[in-house]
């Protein structure tokens, strides 16, 4: 489970992670809070939860021994450097190299020569409509063979690459999404049957409030409703009110 730091501190993280310790479908905790902000608290948290805690690699985590393992990714040189340091402290890690089947083949080759790349890799290749390969990677019981052909050992699907060619001047799907207006309504249980409600116009705004501790996260019953742009006067008025308040 990746919390992206939203548990904020050791005390909050301890309460949530001890509950998740009982869930058999949870194996590892990533970034419950950003450990460099409280390395002593991170060490205490490690002692009080059963399952391993990992964080994106930083040398200070090695010096302070405040995580059980790491997330490592990036270019070849930095990945090898970080993995060597992690191995010297006997810290396992996963490779996080997100991309298509090509990236997955690369990750398999790289990870095969890194002694402590022992945790399940994250490449997200199954999220894409096409792997850009003529043959999909085969994963069996969580393992895949390192491709043995020339180069990365896989054959590129040239037709797929051509079909996904884009005009660099055209806006990306993310840009088109961000151009539209929406209201993000977050609700969670209040007193009795009442609900507490916060509304925002952008993900960045509600993330800022969560990180500041102004609104509580990870409560049972919390819900996010996305209200897409409407032509109604009520939507335009409410969106303008929220935007004027920086929400």
Predicted regions and their residues:
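Flexible C-terminal active-site loop/helix
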Residues: 15, 99-247
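Catalytic core of soluble alpha/beta enzymes
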Residues: 1-106
């Amino acid at each position: 489970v990746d919390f992206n730091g939203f548990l904020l501190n050791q005390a909050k993280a301890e309460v949530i992670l001890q509950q998740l310790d009982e869930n058999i479908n949870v194996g590892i905790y990533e970034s419950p809070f950003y450990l460099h902000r409280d390395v002593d608290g991170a060490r205490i948290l490690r002692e009080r939860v059963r399952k391993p805690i990992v964080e994106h690699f930083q040398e200070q985590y090695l010096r302070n021994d405040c995580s059980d393992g790491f997330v490592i990714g990036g270019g070849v040189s930095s990945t090898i450097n970080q993995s060597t340091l992690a191995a010297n402290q006997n810290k396992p890690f996963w490779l996080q190299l997100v991309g298509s089947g090509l990236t997955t083949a690369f990750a398999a080759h790289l990870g095969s020569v890194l002694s402590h790349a022992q945790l399940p890799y994250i490449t997200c290749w199954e999220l894409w409509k096409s792997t850009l390969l003529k043959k999909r990677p085969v994963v069996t019981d969580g393992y895949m063979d390192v491709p043995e052909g020339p180069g990365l050992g896989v054959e590129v699907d040239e037709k797929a690459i051509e079909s996904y060619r884009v005009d660099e001047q055209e806006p990306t799907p993310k840009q088109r999404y961000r151009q539209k207006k929406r209201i993000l309504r977050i609700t969670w249980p209040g007193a009795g049957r009442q609900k507490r409600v916060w509304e925002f116009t952008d993900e960045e705004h509600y993330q800022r409030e969560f990180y500041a501790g102004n609104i509580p996260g990870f409560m049972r019953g919390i819900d996010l409703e996305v209200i897409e742009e409407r032509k109604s006067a009520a939507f335009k008025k409410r969106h303008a009110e929220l935007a004027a308040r920086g929400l």
